[in-house]
């Protein structure tokens, strides 16, 4: 019976290597989340009309944008495998191909977003300003190219084991948005009051600044490997690897979006409780998301170097770390739900008593939900390190849309569990995805198989 050679470094050493990568990535994830929070806070101060218009436009924009982001996530594993193999030319080609792919995707998506700005407002619900939706979408979409380029540059630094530079740049973007968003929205000093368009412009300009700052750092990290030649093959390879990632992210995001729409049937209080619970989970999810990115880099680096046993260990360490973190978060949430919810809502207001009660019930289900969510995102990251993306897509489609939404709808409507039934469905879908993807990773890294 064929066995894998022993891993080259211990589990403890692998954990240290993973933490060195994951720490800066997690901070960068929180910084990206902070940009969205800043925009929401500024728009909220502009008024209810502006907030509703931005929410409506973002719902359409991000449904498309998240899939394009998924395509760009192919850069990091390509870089990691080339870096692990000592292929400096491969690293440089992955970066060059990634930037060209960002340009091509933007050339397709920007006209689409511009056209959408004329069509989408016609379907806006009552009370949502069509003019504000159109203006926001046109200005906000100007940040698409730098955002995609930033992902390619970030993937290069992460893939070569130097994600720390990304943290400083991301925090710079947060500071910029913190200063510029209110200045443009409210017209500080000599600046004109641009309202919602100003807040959107601040977000777009932050993306351009971050991409510009990260470019020399990523370029310095890539050793000169001579003329790279035509990059068409590399762009195609990145797209082949990335499109299943994009559809996987779209499938997961779509499951949550449809669940939110179904939750609206149970009234505004239950819908608000659902949103508060999801906000809580999303905040904690930034940590396993960073661990997943770092795990993908570690697996890709070791697989590229031909060390399959070490790649397997890297993936298992990442899965263990992610599970431990999410289990800790679940204990905190179950022990002190009111404290957790106080970040998002006034828990002492008697008017919110029903909301808090419903959200606490959802959070009790979310304990397992979070554990499985951390497992699936980390397993997905490990499989991306092996450049395995098509089977995870099929798993995600079945887990999220057949089991997650299908079972949730049955439990909610037929079994009479109401809103909790939808949460049980989400948890079942994530459980199937998590366990299946872990099994896929173990299969891909077993003895006798090439990474």
Curated annotation (Swiss-Prot):
Location (main, coarse): membrane
InterPro entries on file: MATE_fam (IPR002528), MATE_MdtK (IPR050222), MdtK-like (IPR048279)
Transmembrane domains' residue ranges: 23-43, 53-73, 101-121, 132-152, 169-189, 194-214, 243-263, 277-297, 316-336, 355-375, 391-411, 422-442
Pfam families: MatE (PF01554)
Membrane topology: Multi-pass membrane protein
Subcellular location: Cell membrane
Listed GO MF terms: antiporter activity; transmembrane transporter activity; xenobiotic transmembrane transporter activity
UniProt record similarity statement: Belongs to the multi antimicrobial extrusion (MATE) (TC 2.A.66.1) family.
The name this protein goes by in its record: Probable multidrug resistance protein NorM
Protein species of origin: Deinococcus radiodurans (strain ATCC 13939 / DSM 20539 / JCM 16871 / CCUG 27074 / LMG 4051 / NBRC 15346 / NCIMB 9279 / VKM B-1422 / R1)
Encoding gene per record: norM
